[in-house]
Design a protein with these regions (language model features):
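Short, C-terminally biased terminal segments at protein or domain edges
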Residues: 1-137
Length: 137
């Protein structure tokens, strides 16, 4: 199945820029708490890792659903998970579990991914009749 977004057309979710950015987030998120003060905070470490993987999974699951409405809903979840990663890594930096510099490397990736996801959502809102427009909420 091919999905067209403006001038871009995707046949696989791996071609979506937001998914590629999310992959970079996962790699960084897993490396954040390998060592150092936060390595033993299993709950925070697990939540950061699960939220980062959730971004990738929601994008791919939505794409593979073959429904524009489901894709939109999964993109919304992915965007939320992206914000969760950003918040959790901010907390980890504030409580001294990771150096602030590591958070500052991950933060722009989260913002970029969130913007990429929003662009896909906006396109769906404006071009697909079965996707709710924010104007109708």
């Amino acid at each position: 199945m091919s999905r067209t977004f403006g001038m871009a057309s995707f046949t696989k979710f791996e071609e979506i820029e937001a998914w590629k950015t999310a992959e970079l987030i996962v790699v960084q998120a897993y490396g954040l708490l390998k060592a150092g003060p936060g390595a033993r905070d299993w709950a925070l470490k697990d939540q950061i890792q699960r939220a980062s993987v959730s971004v990738m999974c929601n994008i791919s699951e939505g794409f593979e659903s073959r429904s524009d409405r489901t894709f939109y809903d999964m993109l919304r979840r992915a965007k939320g998970s992206c914000g969760e990663v950003r918040t959790l890594t901010y907390v980890a930096a504030k409580i001294g579990h990771i150096p602030l510099e590591k958070y500052e490397l991950l933060r722009p990736l989260c913002i970029k991914c969130s913007s990429q996801i929003q662009a896909l959502m906006t396109h769906l809102e404006t071009t697909r009749p079965d996707v709710p427009s924010r104007k109708r909420w």
